Amino acid sequence: MRYQRVELHNHSTESDGEMTAAELMRWAEKEAYGVVALTDHNTCSGHEKAEKIIQEEQLHIQLLKGIEVTTFYGHILALGIEHMIDFTNLDPRAPEKFLGKLRAAGAGAIGLAHPFCIGRPVTAGCRMDLEIHDWNQIDYIEVFNTSGGTEAMAGHIMGNRQALEFWEEKVLEGYHLAAVSGKDIHQKPQKLPVMITYALLEDSGEDQMEGEEKAVLGSVMRQKTIITKGPLLHAWAEKEDLWIEVDHSSEYENWNLKWATCHPVLRIRGKQIEKELPLRFTKSTEKIKIAGVLKEEQEADSQREHTVVLRMYEENCQYENLLAAGISVRWKSGGNEE
């Protein structure tokens, strides 16, 4: 397993951004992103320009094409799509037909941008007011929008805390949804300690063969993403045991230097359990077994599929101490993770 730093929500001067598509790609290269999506409002006109600068200047990033479908009822992110479609017939009370058209037009993953943004009357249309009935039509939720800066600066406006809790509820209901962050870039971002997204990719080389941007799209569809301020981890279940593999190599927020003095706390939440467990990091890369912690979840119903969601905190489980989130573990009784 390897981790790829990605940014999946960005704008250029093709819509309401201040950087051209070329400037955005150069910025992403400088910031060591691996894959960057260009999701201008209701247009794909920047895709060709972004591809051109990547090729001409031999940048090391990959472009993931996309759109932010911008309506008065919410903003829909469509990744993998290469042309805008007509959305004048979008029914906010039954948007599934339109979501199907997005998929048919090439959208590989469909997500909700800043669903709990403050909305009317301050930012009309930014809050998700679509009445979604079939959540199987949605592939991911942007649970941290960091366009307003840190949580202390703009969390009450962007509604990130609500979005994270909503994502967890939907996942525990059984929906297969990935969680991502989004810088929602409109101008060159400041360097602030905000959540970023990593995609978990396979080591086999198969991902590189199909293209890194397609591999990232696949990670979103498989819910193999993590939102983090530094620590990289993935988790899986083996019967009633939870396993976590942590990697402290990320230089984001100097995590590669800070991890040894960290006092992490893992919060595990399922339908039957909610536990807070202190962890101890001893090596730069290690596997940690938490024996028997999933037993109650399994015993509640031995036939069904089980899911837990994880968060990692520093010191205690106060929201402002959140280090990593957006991690789900799904398994069946008597077996391992799906």
Where are these regions (language model features)?
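C-terminal functional module detector
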Residues: M1-Y3, E23-L24, G174-A178, K183-E338
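A short helix-to-beta-strand connector/capping loop
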Residues: E57-Q62, N136-Q137, Y175
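Short, hydrophobic/aliphatic alpha-helical segments
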Residues: Q162-A178
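A metal-dependent hydrolase metal-coordination microenvironment
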Residues: M1-V122, V143-E151, G155-Q162, F166, ...
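Substrate-binding cleft/loops of secretory-pathway carbohydrate-active enzymes
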Residues: G119-H133, Q187-L200
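Structural recognition of alpha->loop->beta junctions
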Residues: M128-T150, A199-K214
